[in-house]
Amino acid sequence: MTRATFTILLLAACVGLRPAAAAEVRVVSQTVGTDELLLAVAAPEQIAALSHLARDPVFSGVAQAAEAYPMIGMGDAETILRYRPTLVLFSDYSRIELVEQVRRSGVQVLIFNRYESLDDAYANLRQLAAALGDDTARDRAETVIADCRARLAELHRRLQGVKPVRVIAPSTYGVIAGSETTFQDICDQAGAENLAVTLGHLTGHAAPPSEAMLKWPVEVLVLGGANRDEALAPFLKLPPYAFMAAVREGRTALLDAWALGCVTHLRVHAYEQLARQLHPERWQKDGP
């Protein structure tokens, strides 16, 4: 038995020996997505710790709210168990060995594996609320869902009849977002046509067809970041994007960095943010 394994078992035993509190719930979140879900439905006293990226606005849509809570660092099992959790939240991209170590300690784990659409996000909110086991959490989940639905209905009302703007979401990592991605979901709701799907026929995050892309009629690049020039800069010298008119002319829509890959209900913000930039005329009557 390794020293790390012994420590994990000892911590698990200590957790098990603690006097049971009737309604005590202590939740540790291991990913940014589960941070966002947890902060939406849990009471503050139920949140034991959040992920190591919880306060990073590049990745987290709850960076400011997360400042009130501890973070688990890189979050090995020993660190997670030190927060004496009764429930640990993982995603299906969490390390399998980490999930199993926590599970073997006797702590309940909840793994989220669907986040392609807003309906998936609603289901995840309800699943977490049910795991927390109190009516207040369920009420919070339903309130969040109702708010998202109202905002989405208003967005659809404004965008009714618009001609979709032809877009792509370029990446410096050698892939581009196709169908079955959060970016495609954003496009579907924001009045955008993702050319990686309609012309490239790509699924997931796939290698871009570099030569063929040069013929795509890209109207707008969708980028993530806080500064338009900084977000565009890498693509000015990166083939094939450097040869596209949209890149040379700086035709961009800028989303908050975290919003571009958001896997929770907070993606409604991305829908609204992109729609306002692609179809500003639908908001002109509102004034400044």
Language model features: what each stretch is:
Residues 31, 51, 92-93, 114, ...:
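Short secondary-structure boundary segments
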Residues 17-22:
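Sec/Tat signal peptide C-region and signal peptidase I cleavage site
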Residues 182-205, 225, 253-254:
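His/Asp/Glu-enriched short active-site or ligand-binding loop at hydrolase and phosphoryl-transfer sites
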Residues 23-26, 98-175, 196-198, 203-204, ...:
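Extracytoplasmic substrate-binding proteins
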Residues 5-16:
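Bacterial N-terminal signal peptides
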Residues 94-104, 220-238:
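A ligand-binding cleft/hinge motif common to bilobed small-molecule-binding domains
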Residues 26-92, 98, 192-195:
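A short, structured surface patch at a secondary-structure boundary
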Residues 77-84, 207-217:
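Short helices/loops that flank or line small-molecule/ion binding pockets
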